[in-house]
C-alpha cells in the first residue's frame, strides 16, 4: 500500500490545488491513502483534499474551530497489520525526537506520523518516526512530503521534496519587520 504523508499545508484561502506543488497533487491522487498530520487551517482545505484522495487526518494547532471540532487531536489506524499513529505536535524539534518516540510508545504504534515542525525527518528505531515537513511553508528545509510503502509487514519510507521556497520562516520575519517599519 502506498501512503503519502503531509502536514502543515496552511491553506488560508483559495484552492488547495493552487497552493500545493503539482508533483504532490499527482502523488496524492495516485496514493492508496493520504495522511495529513494537521494544520490545514480551514475546513475548505480539508474538504477539498478529501475530495481528491482517501484521507485520514488530525487537527493541528492552527486549524479553525470547525476542524478542531470534527477532527481528533490524535488517532491510530491500522494498515495491513501495521499500526500508524497520527498527531500534530509530537516533537519539540527535529534535532530531538525523544518526545515523538515516547508518544509512539504511548500510542502503541509501529509508525508515528507527526507535523508542526515544518521540517522533514524519518527516523527508525523500534518505531518509525515520520514528519513530512510542509509542502507550502517549510522552515529552513525544502517543501516536502513522505512516501511510505507497506507490503506484507515490510515498511519503507522516504522524504520527497518539491520546488518552492525553502525559508518561509525568514520570509515571515522579513514581512513582519517591513510591515512594522523595521
Language-model-detected regions and their locations in the chain:
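Active-site neighborhood of phospho(di)ester-bond hydrolases with catalytic His/Asp-centered motifs
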Residues: 5-7, 33-39, 55-61, 86-88, ...
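Conserved beta-sheet core of the metallophosphoesterase superfamily
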Residues: 56, 92-158
Amino acid at each position: 500500500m502506498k501512503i503519502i504523508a503531509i502536514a502543515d499545508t496552511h491553506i488560508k484561502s483559495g484552492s488547495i490545488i493552487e497552493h500545493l506543488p503539482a508533483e504532490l497533487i499527482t502523488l496524492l491522487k495516485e496514493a492508496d491513502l493520504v495522511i495529513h498530520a494537521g494544520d490545514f487551517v480551514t475546513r475548505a482545505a480539508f474538504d477539498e483534499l478529501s475530495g481528491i484522495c482517501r484521507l485520514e487526518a488530525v487537527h493541528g494547532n492552527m486549524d479553525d474551530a470547525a476542524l478542531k471540532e470534527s477532527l481528533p487531536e490524535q488517532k491510530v489506524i491500522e494498515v495491513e497489520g501495521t499500526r500508524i499513529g497520527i498527531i500534530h505536535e509530537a516533537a519539540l524539534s527535529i534535532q530531538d525526537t525523544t518526545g515523538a518516540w515516547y508518544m509512539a510508545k504511548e500510542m502503541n504504534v509501529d509508525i508515528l506520523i507527526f507535523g508542526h515542525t515544518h521540517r522533514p525527518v524519518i527516523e527508525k528505531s523500534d518505531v518509525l518516526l515520520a514528519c513530512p515537513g510542509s509542502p507550502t511553508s517549510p522552515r529552513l528545509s525544502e517543501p516536502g512530503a513522505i512516501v511510505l510503502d507497506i507490503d506484507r509487514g515490510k515498511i519503507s519510507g522516504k522524504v520527497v521534496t518539491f520546488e518552492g521556497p525553502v525559508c518561509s520562516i525568514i520570509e515571515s520575519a522579513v514581512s513582519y519587520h517591513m510591515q512594522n517599519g523595521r
